[in-house]
């Protein structure tokens, strides 16, 4: 499954809002025409652009994002998690976008629990 991205200069708010709603996500990485990560956009801000009939996303691209190389170890990723509510994006040495680090993967890695055990813990917390 290829990671979904916002292509700067090619896609406007309408297309991105549809993409995000289809996948039930609220943030997308933004890449330039060469596939280089330039930032991220948030659904709330895209909805505002659409309301204002602005077709270009450049004004809402958040350029200060956390990104790591694919071979970064978990111990080096965890401190980043304390600084952001956004995903941590994975890039190569040229900053070409490759994917993201899902929070659930980090939790599984750190706790040693599998997805099923984590879901059980969550369910128990909901039922309390």
List each model region and its residues.
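Short C-terminal domain-edge/linker segments immediately following a structured domain
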Residues: 60-61, 71, 91, 97-99, ...
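Short hydrophobic beta-strand motif reused across regulatory alpha/beta modules
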Residues: 38-46, 98-106
């Amino acid at each position: 499954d290829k990671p979904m991205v916002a292509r700067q200069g090619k896609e406007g708010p309408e297309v991105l809002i549809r993409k995000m709603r289809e996948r039930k996500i609220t943030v997308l990485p933004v890449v330039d025409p060469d596939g280089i990560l330039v930032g991220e956009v948030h659904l709330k801000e895209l909805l505002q652009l659409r309301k204002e009939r602005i077709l270009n996303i450049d004004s809402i691209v958040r350029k200060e994002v956390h990104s790591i190389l694919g071979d970064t170890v978990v111990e080096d990723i965890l401190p980043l998690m304390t600084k952001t509510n956004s995903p941590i994006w994975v890039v190569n040495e040229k900053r070409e976008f490759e994917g993201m680090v899902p929070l659930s993967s980090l939790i599984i890695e750190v706790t040693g629990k599998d997805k099923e055990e984590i879901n059980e813990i969550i369910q128990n917390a909901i039922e309390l």
